[in-house]
Amino acid sequence: MISLRKSHPLLKIINHAFIDLPAPSNISAWWNFGSLLGICLIIQILTGLFLAMHYTSDTLTAFSSVAHICRDVNYGWLLRNLHANGASMFFMCLFLHVGRGIYYGSYLYKETWNIGVILLLTVMATAFVGYVLPWGQMSFWGATVIMNLLSAIPYIGTTLAEWIWGGFAVDKATLTRFFAFHFILPFIIVAFAAVHLLFLHETGSNNPTGINPDSDKIPFHPYYTIKDALGLIFLILSLLLLGLFSPDLLGDPDNFSPANPLNTPPHIKPEWYFLFAYAILRSIPNKLGGVLALLASILILLIIPLLHTANQRSMMFRPIFQTLFWILTADLITLTWIGGQPVEQPFIIIGQLALMLYFLLILALMPLAGMFENYMLEPKW
């Protein structure tokens, strides 16, 4: 008799995606982050749902409703800490997942990669509107500064900014619509993630060598379900350590003060996971130029498959490319650090040099390194 999971119309889909899925036998722990991102998304949706039951999206009561959640709601403090720090864990997994995709050449699955970039942009948008909801000082001024950048768009910029704000400045209408966006976007992310998986299962997973693994595949369960469970234990432990012992470690002290439009904080900055993009934005003295550089820094991921010039897919056996990859990683860490510093020398010039290096590496040095490697590997006799 055929197993129910193989015959039932619904269970059959789950079976093909998570149980009997043929997976390469040599994929490493770097392939854990896809499942960890799924777990992070579930944690964020569940904690967010319970927080939304007690939150009020009104400028007069938003800040006090967050305080009420932390003080008066049963385990409200835990929900809030897990949700806020869960976002940080989400982005840590996201950056590592993208980094793995670049390192091992997974971007050559173009459909999967492009949906992934759209997912990244959607998650960033969700996190941004979510950061505004507690209505603290940094929430308010972060929203004001970032949304004001829309006014740099020629002709329609000011109208567009006022349309999104729902007025002439960030106010009640902005907070209400940002809450609506923050509620609906995670479900759009779930839909995109399903499409991401659909495209991935059309081609099968890549592996560290970058070589076609069809001749040596094993079922996903039990091998990789157990491997993913280990990653899950580390994720939950890290989240609990952060959420229970240092819940405000990654936050901004200014957000403990209610939003005040008449008092500007000395240094406006977003959450740590946006600092690299914020540093790129500030590195260009021109407002429109900064906005374009900010967009280009993320959208450049879409053209990475077109810039692949090497005959080998993965960086596993390519020392020149590995060196450039780790320089790029160090450059992004530098940009993250610069984004958290005040706008003064020497931070301005360091940010500008890091910005130039970022685009130089992706657009020129990496494609040239691929061509050079091809030349070196050609037989010369």
UniProtKB/Swiss-Prot annotation:
Main location: mitochondrion
GO biological-process terms attached to the record: mitochondrial electron transport, ubiquinol to cytochrome c
Co-factor requirement: heme b
Binding site for heme b b562: 83, 182
One cellular-component annotation, GO: respiratory chain complex III
Coiled coil: none
InterPro entries, A to Z: Cyt_b/b6_C (IPR005798), Cyt_b/b6_C_sf (IPR036150), Cyt_b/b6_N (IPR005797), Cytb/b6-like_sf (IPR027387), Cytochrome_b (IPR030689), Cytochrome_b_C_euk/bac (IPR048260), Cytochrome_b_N_euk/bac (IPR048259), Di-haem_cyt_TM (IPR016174)
Annotated positions binding heme b b566: 97, 196
Gene Ontology molecular functions: metal ion binding; ubiquinol-cytochrome-c reductase activity
Transmembrane segments: 33-53, 77-98, 113-133, 178-198, 226-246, 288-308, 320-340, 347-367
Cofactor note: Binds 2 heme b groups non-covalently.
Cystine residue pairs: none
Family membership: Belongs to the cytochrome b family.
Database matches in PANTHER family: CYTOCHROME B
Name of the protein described by the UniProt record: Cytochrome b
Gene coding for it: MT-CYB
